[in-house]
Amino acid sequence: PNVDIYNACEQFSLVKKYFGKTSGNPVFHFIVVYDAKSTWGNTYERAESMSRSIASYFADRYQIVYGIHNKPCYNKYGKCTSLYHAHFIMNSVSYIDGKMFSGNHSEIYAFLNYIERVTGDKSWKIKYGSGKEKTSEGLTASMQCD
């Protein structure tokens, strides 16, 4: 919500260069999977509204963009699991003061609590990692911005 999606990578890089923080993890990538049944239903408008609210958690300090996918509702057992999920890409360097986002446990769990409040769903689970190890879901600190 605070970046031109067509120039996000360039804008992220300019902030990093301004603060001299060009090494390390370039972005923080996380995915929120919305539960079509218990959370809010299956409309794109609701998914977009939730995604905007979730992105606003970081938007006052970090540049962030998101995209929403609509997936078929059936898993291999024929049950509806989720129609929508959103990918969020956040600059790892704050545009306010150049502070790097650490993604430590306290930051992640504070964010998880925020998602629970926004969605009204208390069943969130979170796993995160570099993506280079075992498969991760939920929040992932990986992705290159070239």
Placement of each model-derived feature along the sequence:
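N-terminal nicking endonuclease/strand-transfer module with a His-rich metal-binding environment
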Residues: P1-D146
